[in-house]
Regions:
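Short acidic active-site motifs
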Residues: 52-56, 77-80, 172, 176
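Short, ordered loop/turn segments at secondary-structure junctions
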Residues: 46-48, 73, 95-96, 133
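Short beta->alpha connector loops
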Residues: 47-50, 71-76, 196
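Amphipathic helical "hinge" segments at domain boundaries
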Residues: 1-67, 145, 152
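Redox-cofactor binding/interface segments in oxidoreductases and associated redox assembly factors
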Residues: 13, 70, 192
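Acidic, Gly/Pro-rich loop/turn segments at junctions of secondary structure
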Residues: 67-80, 92-102
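Short beta-strand segments enriched in small/hydrophobic residues
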Residues: 3-19, 73, 119, 127-134
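Bacterial carbohydrate/catabolite-sensing allosteric modules
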Residues: 29-40, 58-62, 85-92, 96-207
């Protein structure tokens, strides 16, 4: 009973960038499920991590949250594996970071990328570019692997020139698309690792 009285019935959801529309549907689903179980949801934006770090730590120390849900691949503050054991329960969703040793809910990024690239091939495209995310992120590694495997399955040689990288921002997508368009034989279709980069790529392609 004492434990029940000390519960805040509040979950902190850490979002890499609250401005990314990709997360809106995910957050809505989290809030609906949390409400059904009598929990409130706090949203923490990691886009300005240095400013927010103290706030997140204060919430934990003062026991104002019962759990954390990470939608990115990083903790919003430094904590060793040993220190993580003293934190509220944490689950990672959408991303995959083996080094954090957290329970994880995520999609099969390799298969999803393979299917997307294979679809482009079935539409008649042979020169398929890729705007990949940061190299250090596991999900980007798997998505790039899916891209490469799909091309090989379709009998298309992988051309490193057709792979550009960005940091999941609109501007990065735009720059990466321009890089691909500047090639002597630009791709006729492009597979993007994120919706926001895809929007930037589309904007650049229409200029």
């Amino acid at each position: 009973r004492n434990v029940k009285r000390n519960e805040s019935r509040t979950i902190l959801v850490i979002v890499p960038d609250i401005c990314d529309p990709f997360f809106s549907e995910i957050i809505r689903g989290i809030e609906v499920t949390a409400a059904n179980h009598g929990y409130l949801v706090l949203i923490g934006d990691c886009a300005h991590q240095n400013q927010q770090e103290k706030t997140f730590i204060d919430l934990i120390i003062t026991k104002q949250i019962d759990g954390m849900l990470l939608l990115g691949s990083r903790l919003p503050f430094d904590a060793s594996i040993e220190e993580q054991r003293n934190l509220p329960p944490m689950v990672m969703a959408n991303e995959f970071a083996p080094e954090l040793e957290l329970p994880t809910v995520h999609i099969d990024n390799l298969t999803a990328a393979f299917d997307a690239v294979n679809y482009l091939y079935e539409q008649g495209h042979k020169r398929i570019g890729c705007i990949a995310g940061p190299e250090e992120m596991p999900l980007c590694h798997y998505r790039l692997q899916g891209y490469v495997q799909a091309l090989r399955r379709c009998g298309i040689m992988v051309d490193p020139q057709y792979i550009a990288r960005g940091d999941f921002t609109f501007e990065a997508g735009s720059r990466a698309m321009q890089q691909l368009l500047d090639l002597p034989q630009p791709p006729t279709a492009v597979f993007c690792h994120s919706d926001v980069m895809a929007l930037g790529a589309l904007s650049q392609a229409k200029r």
